[in-house]
């Protein structure tokens, strides 16, 4: 029910506004998103909205990011969408590992801070920033027109090599 979902999100926004500091509101927002959305690969598309992710309670990185952005902005906290890559393995210096396309949030708290709501952590050296924007539509990793068979798919493979520590 859309009305109930809107009422629930409005209640979450009020919880954020009730915090003493922006840092507390940002931390609470991350917790709220993690508590209400579960990671489910392939459960959504790039056109899935934050409202749809809230309603289904599942999504992928861009859904976690859009959900967090919608709450933060509704609470008056500036935030932006970040597109990039994430490598999830520790590797030796100079060793190449596979990375994954990924999305996370940057939020203004006296300076821009990166938060990864999908993995419930601060953005660090495992995150490789490619672009920033208002939402996914501003910074898709690939954009264009394809003409061909209807059954075609697209895959992304990323290799990351850390050169310095």
Q: What are these model-predicted stretches?
A:
Residues 31, 63-152:
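Hydrophobic/aromatic-rich core segments of domains that either
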Residues 1-59, 67, 75, 136, ...:
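Secondary-structure boundary elements
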């Amino acid at each position: 029910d859309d009305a109930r979902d809107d009422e629930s999100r409005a209640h979450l926004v009020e919880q954020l506004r009730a915090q003493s500091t922006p840092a507390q509101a940002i931390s609470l927002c991350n917790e709220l998103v993690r508590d209400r959305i579960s990671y489910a690969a392939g459960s959504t598309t790039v056109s899935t909205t934050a409202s749809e992710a809230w309603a289904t309670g599942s999504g992928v990185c861009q859904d976690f990011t859009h959900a967090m952005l919608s709450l933060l902005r509704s609470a008056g906290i500036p935030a932006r969408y970040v597109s990039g890559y994430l490598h999830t393995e520790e590797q030796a210096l100079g060793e190449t590992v596979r990375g994954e396309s990924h999305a996370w949030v940057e939020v203004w708290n006296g300076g821009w801070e990166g938060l990864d709501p999908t993995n419930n952590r601060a953005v660090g050296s495992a995150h490789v920033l490619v672009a920033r924007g208002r939402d996914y539509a501003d910074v898709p990793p690939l954009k264009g027109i394809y003409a061909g068979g209807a059954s075609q798919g697209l895959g992304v493979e990323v290799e990351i090599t850390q050169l310095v520590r």
